[in-house]
């Protein structure tokens, strides 16, 4: 379902997420499951970014699949916000990606917008229980709580060591945290009669900075 959003409404929500982050709360959201098409038909002419993933004050999580190699899940939404500009913490990462992308998909997205997702993790072949029956599901709504649970474990260790929780994650992820993420360089998120955005070395609008390594995250936060 597509819900029309105003810039004012999006800004109010985004500012609320920023306030939570300042209070030590880490906000994570699924990037979406429509590839670059977002919630519209795959025959679209322009990419549609999802919200709230476009808000720079939360951490957007995309989906991957497989092991050795781990690749982008083709349904994983990603792109560039039409409401929010590129934040300072990711300006270098986005600039590097856009330079490598060149003219591919030119005119179909806002090259001046905040890029998402920030990170990713496995989002395929999850099992859930519905009315007592086990079902298999895929989606970034599987990936986001998985990444969030890892951050919860890191915060638990930090608090036990007498330190503050991570709170707003993105400045950390795009700096010291990069060393604790597995860079995903294969796959894409098709839509709008295109191959979407390709995963590349470094940040990309399919898998973000990559998938988490718990042990390396502990090292990155000084534990």
Residue spans for each PLM region:
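Extracellular protease catalytic domains of secreted zymogens
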Residues: 1-223
């Amino acid at each position: 379902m597509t819900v029309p959003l105003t810039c004012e409404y999006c800004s109010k929500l985004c500012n609320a997420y920023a306030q939570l982050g300042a209070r030590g709360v880490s906000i994570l959201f699924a990037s979406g499951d429509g590839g670059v098409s977002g919630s519209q038909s795959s025959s679209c002419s322009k990419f549609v970014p999802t919200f709230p993933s476009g808000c720079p004050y939360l951490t957007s999580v995309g989906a991957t699949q497989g092991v050795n190699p781990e690749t982008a899940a083709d349904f994983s939404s990603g792109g560039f916000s039409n409401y929010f500009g590129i934040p300072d913490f990711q300006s270098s990462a986005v600039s590097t990606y856009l330079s490598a992308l060149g003219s591919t998909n030119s005119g179909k997205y806002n090259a001046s917008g905040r890029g998402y997702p920030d990170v990713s993790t496995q989002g395929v072949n999850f099992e859930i229980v519905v009315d007592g029956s086990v079902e298999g599901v895929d989606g970034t709504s599987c990936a986001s709580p998985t990444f969030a649970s890892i951050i919860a474990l890191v915060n638990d260790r930090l608090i036990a060591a007498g330190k503050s929780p991570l709170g707003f994650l993105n400045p950390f992820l795009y700096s010291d945290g990069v060393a604790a993420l597995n860079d995903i360089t294969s796959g894409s998120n098709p839509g709008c009669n295109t191959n979407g955005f390709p995963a590349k070395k470094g940040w990309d609008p399919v898998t973000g900075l990559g998938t988490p390594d718990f042990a390396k995250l502990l090292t990155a936060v000084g534990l």
